[in-house]
From Swiss-Prot:
Keywords: Ribonucleoprotein, Ribosomal protein, RNA-binding, rRNA-binding. This is Small ribosomal subunit protein uS19. GO terms for molecular function: rRNA binding; structural constituent of ribosome. The gene is rpsS. Protein S19 forms a complex with S13 that binds strongly to the 16S ribosomal RNA. GO terms for biological process: ribosomal small subunit assembly; translation. It comes from the Bacteria. Pfam families: Ribosomal_S19. InterPro entries: Ribosomal_uS19, Ribosomal_uS19_bac-type, Ribosomal_uS19_CS, Ribosomal_uS19_SF. It comes from Synechococcus sp. (strain JA-3-3Ab) (Cyanobacteria bacterium Yellowstone A-Prime). Gene3D superfamilies: 30s Ribosomal Protein S19, Chain A (3.30.860.10). The keyword Ribonucleoprotein applies. PANTHER family: RIBOSOMAL PROTEIN S19P FAMILY MEMBER, SMALL RIBOSOMAL SUBUNIT PROTEIN US19M. Belongs to the universal ribosomal protein uS19 family.
Length: 93
């Protein structure tokens, strides 16, 4: 189920404030955020936002196709290391 239309999309207030200030000054530098739940808005297009994945900040360039999605969707939190390999000693027996 989606969020109620009367509430509007969730965006971290500090993140939105930083984006709006950068748009006023026509600046384009990276912004660090821990807010993975923030929705991407049209005012964020063209900015690079470094989203925290639990270990480090991963930079993401925002495009028009990302609008409406959450920041956390584009930064995986888990790394797949592969399944256990075949044990050659066990295979011989």
């Amino acid at each position: 189920m989606g969020r109620s239309l009367k509430k509007g999309p969730f965006v971290d207030a500090k993140l939105l404030l930083k984006i709006e200030k950068m748009n006023e000054r026509n600046e384009k530098h990276m912004i660090k955020t821990w807010s993975r739940a923030s929705t991407i808005l049209p005012v964020m297009i063209g900015h690079t936002i470094a989203v925290h994945n639990g270990k480090q900040h991963v930079p993401i360039y925002i495009t028009d196709q990302m609008v409406g999605h959450k920041l956390g969707e584009f930064v995986p939190t888990r790394t797949f290391r592969g399944h256990a390999g075949s044990d050659k000693k066990a295979a011989r027996r």
